[in-house]
Amino acid sequence: VPPASVSVSAALLAADARTGHRWPAAMLMVASGFAALGYQIVWTQQASLWLGHESAGVFAVVAAFFGGIAIGALALGPRIERSASPGRWYAGCELLIAVWSIALAVMLDDVTRAMLQWIGPSPAPAWHWSLAFTGTLLVLLPATAAMGATLPAMESVLGRRHDGGRSIALLYAANTLGAVMGVLAAAFLLIPHMGLLRTALVCAVLNLLCAGLSLTLAVRPAAAATAPTPAARSVLVTLFATGLLGIGYEVLVVRVLTQVTENTVYTFAILLTLYLVGTAAGAAAFGRWVSTRVEP
């Protein structure tokens, strides 16, 4: 068989493998997103205990959640991209999320006492808010950093560069759709009927299932690291500004609505759901738009 035919056949087989694993990977991202935002609601309730108010818990957890995700993506993303086993990275991240989140739920009383002692009985506002954000970030960092690495890991499993971005759009939309379901289920169903610990256990089971099932997905060869181009840097700046404005508006609306609503956590859950629905719809629309312009 001529070498050219071998290379073409290998490329076709690789494309078939990616296509065959795209939807199973999306289902894993739905479950992972459900667990992640379920944890966020659980952590918001926990943080409200040691910070003394639900609005403080919302702001601290939002900052710690997205800050940890950014740290994880920046710190682990390049290593995962160069790895020959991104599926194992993904499984390891899901396992770490499950273990750390269960530990936080089990040690809720101990963590609350430690944070209250750290803050003190009558803290100055600057001291109180500094410790609220810093302490919450450090407490949640292992889990949130692992969350930040899951999307790059699954993206590496599928090999985004070969399909014009359709895989990453599908994964992002699926992850966000799962997040919507996780917010609603945790805030309005699981926590009221099962409590914080059992809700965290439900989310942890999903993480463990994702960890095990992800090992069955195809693994692509490790990719060579590439330096970001000026165009890529400008896109990152745009995405940073978009995230800043999007979450900033969300927190602002939560702050305003606390003046007229009784329960900040439920208000936050509803607003977060609306934000995530729009984000998922945009990612799905982008994926369809790209698919009409890029050959499979």
Which residues make up each language-model segment?
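Alpha-helical transmembrane segments of multi-pass membrane proteins
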Residues: 1-296
